[in-house]
Amino acid sequence: MIFPIDRVQYSITKNKFYLFEFVMVENIYSLEQMLQQKTNFWANFKKSIDIVHRNKLDLIPKLNNNIAKHIIIYQKDVDDLIIVLFIGQGKYIPHKYTFKKLSNYFRKLNGIDGITSSKGLGVVRSDNEDNFVNAILTELYELDDKYSDDCGLEITKRLLDGDETKGFDIDLFQYISSTREYILYEFLKNETGYISNIKAHPMRYSWTNRKDDNKRKFISLWRAKRYFEGKLYLINYSNDKNEKISISEVIDLSEANGFIEENKYCMSYNIFIAWLKDMHKYTKKHNYYLSDFRHKNYDKDFFAHWKASKKDYGKGFYD
């Protein structure tokens, strides 16, 4: 199953990942009553949420024990009660917080490694929801109504209270049981207006030494990919569904200098959605997930001379 991960943060000093899943409910006080009555809170809570969140909450407890996992349950515009589930060793430990108390904890954890350069949360998109990803989830789960979820972005901004975020979201995340492999999908919206999805690439705006450099995002994704020992797919798309979508499987990356090697694929929007639907229910034993598609390998020699070679990036794929 495929779903988004709301927030992941890696601490260099602790060598540890912190994961946050935000679930907005209609009545937080009814959940508080379940806690007080010592009923089967976890089972009853899962019944009250949508299928995408249920799938996430089924997988999160099974992730590596070195990941500190938090489920934050809140009600919009209610600040006197937030329920946080700390998950470890297969146990769900609930704690009650006020918004202020949770914000103090959240900001302290966000700054655990001290001051580092990082883009502010929400800079990439002006609204809180990622409509492209939500539309994909609507198709994958065959929902009657369009899926709507801001992945906790609004409450995260409030919790940080202006601090620069050290965390990031994973647009789509998957564990494939037949291959025992994790997949990370990151969607990169092409808003340049002058470069096609096929020629778009993070090296055009990362590892540039400019103020708007976005390398931290890709370093964080690369660390997560290595931690999970999985695959990382970067998907370049635009608002024009008639334009081909570009997928880059990141094979190797240097935190200091950028991309070292990748395999690149291109396909139409409709074929991309069909491929994702196949991935959503993948049961094959091999992990050649894109074996049906033509690809081009860009190696260390290509990326070592990126300034000169970028004009040739994407050649061989037709717009």
At which residue positions do the language-model features occur?
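Short, well-structured alpha-helical interface segments that form or flank functional binding sites
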Residues: 2, 165-170, 212-223
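Conserved catalytic cores of phosphodiester-cleaving nucleases, focusing on short active-site segments
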Residues: 3-59, 170-199
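Surface-exposed cleft-lining segments at the edges of enzyme active sites
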Residues: 24-26, 153-160, 194-209
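A short acidic, glycine-rich active-site loop
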Residues: 45-57, 202-219
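Nucleic-acid nuclease catalytic cores
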Residues: 50-89, 219-252
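Polybasic, proline/glycine-rich intrinsically disordered low-complexity segments
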Residues: 244-288
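Charged phosphate-binding loop/patch that engages nucleotide di/tri-phosphates or the phosphate backbone
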Residues: 272-319
